[in-house]
From Swiss-Prot:
Designated name of the protein: Cadherin-related family member 5
Segments of skewed composition (Pro residues): 729-762
Residue stretches spanning the membrane: 670-690
UniProt-annotated stretches for the region Disordered: 452-661, 724-789, 811-845
Chain's gene name: CDHR5
UniProt function note: Intermicrovillar adhesion molecule that forms, via its extracellular domain, calcium-dependent heterophilic complexes with CDHR2 on adjacent microvilli. Thereby, controls the packing of microvilli at the apical membrane of epithelial cells. Through its cytoplasmic domain, interacts with microvillus cytoplasmic proteins to form the intermicrovillar adhesion complex/IMAC. This complex plays a central role in microvilli and epithelial brush border differentiation.
Residues the record marks as carrying a glycan: 44, 81, 140, 198, 297, 308, 405, 526
Cytoplasmic side: 691-845
Disulfide bonds: none
GO terms for biological process, alphabetical: brush border assembly; cell adhesion; cell differentiation; homophilic cell adhesion via plasma membrane adhesion molecules; intermicrovillar adhesion; regulation of microvillus length
Amino acid sequence: MGSWALLWPPLLFTGLLVRPPGTMAQAQYCSVNKDIFEVEENTNVTEPLVDIHVPEGQEVTLGALSTPFAFRIQGNQLFLNVTPDYEEKSLLEAQLLCQSGGTLVTQLRVFVSVLDVNDNAPEFPFKTKEIRVEEDTKVNSTVIPETQLQAEDRDKDDILFYTLQEMTAGASDYFSLVSVNRPALRLDRPLDFYERPNMTFWLLVRDTPGENVEPSHTATATLVLNVVPADLRPPWFLPCTFSDGYVCIQAQYHGAVPTGHILPSPLVLRPGPIYAEDGDRGINQPIIYSIFRGNVNGTFIIHPDSGNLTVARSVPSPMTFLLLVKGQQADLARYSVTQVTVEAVAAAGSPPRFPQRLYRGTVARGAGAGVVVKDAAAPSQPLRIQAQDPEFSDLNSAITYRITNHSHFRMEGEVVLTTTTLAQAGAFYAEVEAHNTVTSGTATTVIEIQVSEQEPPSTDVPPSPEAGGTTGPWTSTTSEVPRPPEPSQGPSTTSSGGGTGPHPPSGTTLRPPTSSTPGGPPGAENSTSHQPATPGGDTAQTPKPGTSQPMPPGVGTSTSHQPATPSGGTAQTPEPGTSQPMPPSMGTSTSHQPATPGGGTAQTPEAGTSQPMPPGMGTSTSHQPTTPGGGTAQTPEPGTSQPMPLSKSTPSSGGGPSEDKRFSVVDMAALGGVLGALLLLALLGLAVLVHKHYGPRLKCCCGKAPEPQPQGFDNQAFLPDHKANWAPVPSPTHDPKPAEAPMPAEPAPPGPASPGGAPEPPAAARAGGSPTAVRSILTKERRPEGGYKAVWFGEDIGTEADVVVLNAPTLDVDGASDSGSGDEGEGAGRGGGPYDAPGGDDSYI
């Protein structure tokens, strides 16, 4: 027993050593059956991850190394406390501490690996990116690097795919991406600022290769590319004779200057002033002008900014200047050169000329000083007086204007202004002098200014003349419908005018146009001119016979209505031969001349006198009322000439008949209906005449084709065969087309007659020789239509025998004609009469 006691401890120790390790752990340490787990992100795990074996007397807790708030221990089980997110934490760790009585016995670690899931969309670092691209950027160069266009995806394992979509049509031809996974922007073709100054793209990124893959996320951004123009083109002198936007064939300028004069203004060149602009309009650098060759003696100066070419010194003799003008950009990068040809021409020094001899203006009554006189033809526009140099248009700017004989008005440039308040209505005449400060030439013209009660109305109803006034308000009306029977070549203008109008104060010299007629000058269209009485015994002479009255050319007639002259006055009408030129007009001009009270004498121009009259555009009618008080009113005599003021508008009587208006639409429609009916009747009459004269021919053409006419030797001088009375053969001298053919030695058979040839008269055949010498010859020849022709010559036919040629076909003897042709030699020559075979195709002599 003692030996067993000695062996017991070693056996017990050996048994303890050979026991399984797990049995010892279960008895003394904490344990788990699995310490590594895999969980997809965004998965809510509610089941316990692992069960913890805790020995009796021990407790388990989470250590400090555990992922905060990720786990919890409930009982002896480990739970996942959060929804895992791969982008936030891809690996979760739980530290398990087993303690017994505050003493750490076992330490365990459990790991949770979070699996990545494609749950995030890619994002661009920008919404819109705007890039400036130089126009001269080389092709295949990278415009925007990859790093500036990459998108970011929180799913770190995702591969992004990029697509460039155009928003500007055709923009994809210029730019593209380097590859589908590399979003660098590359230039594919040269840029053109003028064709496409800017382009817009839509950049799209996707985190899957295809659109149908689930899940798939996309993102977009906008790219704006602004093309910056490059300095590629030099300045262009305009206008280009040819330009396609890239190349300009520059203009060359031409001008002329008078010798011995210095022009006060820049030269007027053709095709326009010197002007250049930057060929790169996007850059549009300012242009600096200079003359670097051809400026002999410094004759010309060019403005460096505007390019205006002026004369610095006069040219003594005619010559030609060839100036080379350079236009250079302000940044001195590029320049261009053109040629300016200036010819110095000897000037005759002609005075300036006015395009009109009479200008008409209007201004409201009561207008103060400094009011602009309006144009009577266009009341909304100021009246402009412009003279022109007949030789050099460059000298027009050197012309100054002034009013020489009136203190109520003044010139300011080309515009007429009032100098005082116009309190009285009427017509004023002022003379304007144009003075060329270079050539010292002068010219004058006349302005007729109507002072009316109010601004010229735009309606066509003229206001009634004011009571007691000598001149009613002047109005201008325009009608588009011509009023028959007065001829009109344009819109009819009616203006009311009156007498002489108010007189200027003392010291003012009025110089109206030379006219013995105080009434307003006729206008451009239908016009009426009232000539008031001449009180106080004054004498108004009208043209006498034989006088010549120069009047501007007009279209229409001149009618003069001259009432009786009471109080013993005489009224003389124009005598034959009187030439009374009227103002050029396209309508009718009527001149009313009131009576001449106070015993005055109103004489019409005598023969040979000249009375200028205002130009009209149509017919002029002059109404001359009675001249009371014993005055004498003489009408123009033949040959007189009455010059009157030139005008283009027609003053009409204010208070004329209201029926002198345009026709209404109903009137024109009625006139059109009448004209249409007349046209229809004319067409019907024409149809009847055509049917009467050409009806048989039309029936013949529409019916059976006519029988072919025989073509023989017809003598039109003889009567047809159906006539009973035979006429002798006419003499060759009476034949309209005599054809004398010499008689051959022996008669030859006649050839085929041409369709259009005229047969020889038989008289000419007899003149060739004696009929007794003629032998009988029978000839036949094939005609084109298949018939035969037979000719017989008689030997014993006397000279007194009549020769008759028959070739008059008839419709009822065709058979006889055929039989006559077949019976060729049986007495047809002498015994057969002309009636044997009428209408046959044979000629019997």
